[in-house]
UniProtKB/Swiss-Prot annotation:
Originating species: Aeropyrum pernix (strain ATCC 700893 / DSM 11879 / JCM 9820 / NBRC 100138 / K1)
Assembly, per entry: Homodimer.
Family designation: Belongs to the glutamyl-tRNA reductase family.
Single GO molecular function: glutamyl-tRNA reductase activity
Residue numbers binding substrate: T46, C47, N48, R49, S97, D102, H103, E104, Q108
Keywords: NADP, Oxidoreductase, Porphyrin biosynthesis
Pathway field: Porphyrin-containing compound metabolism; protoporphyrin-IX biosynthesis; 5-aminolevulinate from L-glutamyl-tRNA(Glu): step 1/2
Cited PROSITE patterns: GLUTR
Protein name: Glutamyl-tRNA reductase
Lineage of the species this protein comes from: Archaea, Thermoproteota, Thermoprotei, Desulfurococcales, Desulfurococcaceae
InterPro entries: 4pyrrol_synth_GluRdtase, 4pyrrol_synth_GluRdtase_dimer, 4pyrrol_synth_GluRdtase_N, GluRdtase_CS, GluRdtase_dimer_dom_sf, GluRdtase_N_sf, NAD(P)-bd_dom_sf, Shikm_DH/Glu-tRNA_Rdtase
């Protein structure tokens, strides 16, 4: 059953970002075009990848899916069966992301699957595969540290300060200078991982400062003009700086003489604080921390891959059980038709005066011989071939029962 699964796609490693972005922009159009022509389709479309997952692709569907290749047909990735499933599980687990352990991709996989289900484009095979992929992605994140923390400079700045303070940032008095994306990232990383006592945001325009403070819900927050920093700096345990400009906002002597803040991390480019050993840290130290955090994630790749292989085995078991149930239903339908024919023959015999007991015995004997004949043919095939797949067994039994049922006529009231 897994052999029916296929993936055709491109990503930023095999095609240009511009090409992937164009495909992402029109992904719903591609989903409708391929979805209505195929047995089953799910398309994962992000800024990094455009991948079409198919159940039993036909030549037409393959041609449609191949249209996503870059000009010249380059960059197209094709995977089949268990390889396609393994790739999807790696995507959901964040192992194929630009940033290993990426959090967002799991939600992107979920939304892609749900969109196809909403349009009626999924099949039991695709539903099982995507359900297992989401479970795998969740397991990898909960049973490993591959997604712990962030790996951007904002997250690295927070991680560096927490390690330098020794006990982390719970209960700390924290200042953030700036209101741009980097400052927002610092606030998000800070209040996602830690629970500071108070967060004070200093900015030239306090209105924008509330965008930063808003990332620390449930924490006492202050937004103050930048010129208030000099008055309050000694009350802070840690200070983060992320602003544009080249003018120092703190005097070296003040930093060297002061007891607080114990740690200042400045990710501004260029830095706007004086470098003071052991107290003030700039981008080189933050870059080292980001590198360390990424290396920590990379250490968890073998554990993540082991989980993926476990879940692939579970997927194959689930698909095997599903296929067995489908085969069982198919064989039972064929048996029901055969039983119905015997029932009709028995009724005809009774109407023609056959003794009821004799009619039942004849019907049972006839049914047993016919089922036994089908089983005998199955055993002969197994002996000749040496091994039969589930599909072979189903095909032999269903075709044999259908042939017997077709030939089960009756003459002159005979039930034999």
């Amino acid at each position: 059953m897994i052999d029916r699964l296929a993936m055709i796609g491109v990503n930023v490693k095999t095609a240009s970002r511009e090409h992937v972005a164009r495909l992402e922009k029109e992904w719903e159009k591609h989903l409708d075009t391929i979805g209505y022509a195929s047995r089953g389709t799910v398309i994962i479309a992000t800024c990094n990848r455009f991948e079409v997952y198919l159940d039993s692709p036909s030549r037409l569907v393959e041609d449609l899916a191949s249209s996503i290749a870059s000009p010249g047909g380059e960059g197209l990735v094709r995977l089949q069966g268990i390889d396609a499933a393994r790739h999807l599980f790696r995507v959901a687990s964040g192992l194929e992301s630009q940033i290993i352990g990426d959090h967002e991709v799991l939600g992107q996989v979920r939304r892609a699957w749900l969109k196809s289900r909403e349009k009626g484009f999924t099949t039991p095979l695709l539903d099982e595969v995507f359900h297992r992929a989401l479970k795998t992605g969740a397991r990898v994140r909960s049973e490993s540290a591959i997604s712990s923390g962030g790996v951007g400079y904002s997250s690295a700045a927070v991680s560096l300060a927490a390690s330098l303070l020794g006990g982390g940032l719970d209960g700390a008095r924290v200042g953030i200078v700036g209101a741009g994306m980097a400052a927002v990232g610092i606030a998000r990383a800070l209040c996602t991982r830690w629970r500071p006592r108070v967060v004070a945001v200093f900015n030239r325009t306090p209105e924008r400062g509330w965008e930063v403070a808003g990332k620390c819900r449930g924490v006492e927050s202050l937004v103050l003009p930048l010129d208030e920093l000099a008055k309050l700096i000694n009350e802070l345990d840690a200070l983060f700086v992320a602003i544009a400009g080249s003018t120092n906002i703190l005097e070296r002597g003040r930093v060297e003489r002061g007891v607080s803040p114990r740690v200042i991390v400045d990710i501004s480019n260029p830095p706007v604080t004086p470098k003071v050993a052991g107290r003030v840290f700039h981008m080189p130290e933050v870059e080292e921390e980001a590198k360390r955090m990424m290396e920590e994630r990379l250490r968890w790749i073998p554990a993540a891959e082991a989980i993926i292989e476990e879940e692939l085995e579970a997927l194959l078991d689930a698909l095997s059980r599903r296929r067995a149930r489908e085969s069982s239903r198919s064989v039972m339908r064929a048996l029901s038709i055969l039983a119905e024919r015997e029932y009709e023959r028995t009724l005809a015999g009774l109407r023609n005066g056959v003794d009821p007991r004799e009619a039942v015995e004849l019907a049972l004997n006839s049914y047993t011989k016919k089922v036994g004949g089908a089983l005998r043919r199955l055993l002969e095939e197994a002996s000749d071939r040496g091994q039969l797949s589930l599909e072979d067994i189903e095909a032999i039994l269903v075709s044999e029962f259908a042939r017997i049922a077709e030939n089960s006529g009756f003459k002159n009231g005979s039930t034999g």
